[in-house]
Amino acid sequence: MFADITTKLKSQMPELRGRMLANEPLAPLTWFRVGGPAQVLFTPADENDLAYFLRHLPEEIPIYCIGVGSNLIVRDRGLPGVVIRLAPRGFGEVTTDGDTVHAGAAALDKRVAEAAAAADIGGLEFYFGIPGTIGGALRMNAGANGSETKDVLVEARAVSRRGDKITVDNAGMKFEYRNSAIYPSVIFTGGTFRGRRAEPEAIRARMNEVQSHRETVQPIREKTGGSTFKNPPGQSAWKLIDAAGMRGHRVGGAQVSEMHCNFLINTGEATARDIETLGETVRARVKEHAGVDLQWEIKRIGLEA
């Protein structure tokens, strides 16, 4: 358990409207269902509330922002400082205008694809198969099926650590493979995306194809965090893992998925340490077998056990 600093913080922020909780368990907020508590979990009411909070939060207190926890391992001892979780009520709106889609950071990627399809906007179908939020997509340059966030983003909305509301264009995002280099200097609050006019039947067919592929090759009904490692240039991480003999390998309650080797799963009783140790074991075996250093795609946060 961490020291309770919420009373002091609330006294410094009399106009705060969001919810602030001390020592709040984070495991229920992640897809792996593992990990310790946040010293403080803050859910802002809206963008103005978030900006107010950050302006008044002492600079020495660390912060981390999470969405639905679909690409995340929270370590067993939890996180000191403040974890900010953007909720759909204040950050989940999705609207369309011509060939553009405006989405809050808490909007599910799948919902953005559906909104685009309803407006006959093509090019965003790949979001239909990504199990996260737009905030995470901006943070990670999320992609699937040959498309990435950088391909469709016009601009992102964000709040800086100092509490300034800013707009960042595509170039300013400094996109890399599965990363936006501008983070963690900002917290993304939404984005504007541009697609193209397309026939509704073609859009729906593409979305069905994306969903069918995902259900066929990924363990979507397991406690998992999505793709564990980035694909090395010109190679597939899952093929390297399989060739190293790691399909089905276990550490405690964690297992390399039999269905897709680049997915780790919590079989029911795993700890965060089990999952991270399994991932590091996979990395070591692939390095030994193929000479390739796999890089984590899943984010790992919190104190080491």
UniProtKB/Swiss-Prot annotation:
Its EC number is 1.3.1.98. Keywords: Cell cycle, Cell division, Cell shape, Cell wall biogenesis/degradation, Cytoplasm, FAD, Flavoprotein, NADP, Oxidoreductase, Peptidoglycan synthesis. GO terms for molecular function: FAD binding; UDP-N-acetylmuramate dehydrogenase activity. It comes from the Bacteria. Signal peptide: none annotated. The keyword Acetylation does not apply. It is an enzyme of class 1 (oxidoreductase). Its main location: cytoplasm. Residues 33-198 form the FAD-binding PCMH-type domain. This is UDP-N-acetylenolpyruvoylglucosamine reductase. It comes from Nitrobacter hamburgensis (strain DSM 10229 / NCIMB 13809 / X14).
